[in-house]
């Protein structure tokens, strides 16, 4: 069954008091799989199944949880990934595969796109630090490979970050932030975000952030009794 059909049926099934009916778990899991296969997303469904796993621990399926976490990473910079983590019981967090997703999430949330693309392309070299999060970096591309559209989602996320942090950016740097994207792909993404090509296309003008700053005046009304109390408290004592 397609994602659209599953989505429609589930939204009817989880409406009102039936939202956390444990009988919905199987259909919710099937819908999550459809999201993975068809590159779709529904926040309500992914958070509902995580809550049902909390309420019905005997139905817990880590494979589905991993899919949910990776899908929420695909909609950064929304807070869905953080919300999803909060709906996983602490006794489940020791899983090595879950930890790998959390570590990947930390890389993306910190906008460390250079590290992300090294991991994806097999160019990452783990450090000797005992706390090195990616001691087996080859597991990362295997983990995200089944997630249709994952790399494209990260590219769009990177462009959204660039839109609010850069005024202009060189095409070469933009290509690196997008994982070595071709000139054609870089130009297409730049156009989709409304960036203007400058200097024979070697630089993109992103936005004049200084020109869009909005000032805000905050007025606070102070009542006279408050002033009187303040003056009384600082008045020096009378000397006789």
From Swiss-Prot:
The keyword Protein biosynthesis applies. GO terms for biological process: formation of cytoplasmic translation initiation complex; positive regulation of apoptotic process; regulation of translational initiation; translational initiation. It is found in: Cytoplasm. Transmembrane segments: none annotated. Pfam families: CSN8_PSD8_EIF3K. It comes from the Eukaryota. Residues 41-221 form the PCI domain. GO terms for molecular function: ribosome binding; RNA binding; translation initiation factor activity. Keywords: Cytoplasm, Initiation factor, Protein biosynthesis. Disulfide bonds: none annotated. One of its GO terms (cellular component) is eukaryotic 48S preinitiation complex. Component of the eukaryotic translation initiation factor 3 (eIF-3) complex, which is involved in protein synthesis of a specialized repertoire of mRNAs and, together with other initiation factors, stimulates binding of mRNA and methionyl-tRNAi to the 40S ribosome. The eIF-3 complex specifically targets and initiates translation of a subset of mRNAs involved in cell proliferation. Belongs to the eIF-3 subunit K family. Component of the eukaryotic translation initiation factor 3 (eIF-3) complex. This is Eukaryotic translation initiation factor 3 subunit K.
């Amino acid at each position: 069954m397609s994602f659209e059909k599953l989505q429609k049926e589930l939204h009817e099934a989880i409406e009102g008091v039936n939202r956390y009916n444990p009988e919905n778990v199987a259909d919710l899991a099937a819908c999550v799989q459809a999201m993975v296969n068809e590159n779709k997303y529904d926040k309500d469904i992914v958070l509902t199944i995580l809550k049902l796993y909390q309420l019905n621990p005997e139905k817990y399926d880590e494979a589905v949880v991993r899919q949910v976490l990776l899908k929420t990473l695909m909609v950064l910079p929304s807070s869905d990934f953080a919300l999803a983590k909060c709906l996983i019981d602490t006794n489940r967090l020791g899983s090595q595969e879950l930890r790998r997703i959390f570590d990947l999430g930390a890389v993306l949330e910190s906008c460390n796109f250079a590290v992300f693309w090294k991991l994806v392309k097999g160019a990452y070299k783990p450090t000797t630090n005992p706390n090195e999060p990616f001691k087996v970096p080859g597991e990362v591309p295997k983990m995200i490979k089944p997630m249709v559209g994952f790399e494209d989602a990260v590219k769009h996320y990177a462009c959204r970050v660039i839109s609010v942090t850069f005024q202009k950016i060189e095409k070469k740097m933009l290509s690196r932030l997008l994982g070595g994207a071709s000139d054609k792909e870089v130009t297409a993404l730049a156009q989709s975000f409304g960036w203007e090509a400058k200097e024979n296309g070697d630089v993109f003008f992103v936005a004049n952030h200084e020109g869009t700053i909005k000032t805000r005046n905050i007025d606070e009304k102070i009542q006279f009794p408050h002033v009187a109390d303040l003056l009384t408290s600082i008045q020096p004592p009378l000397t006789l």
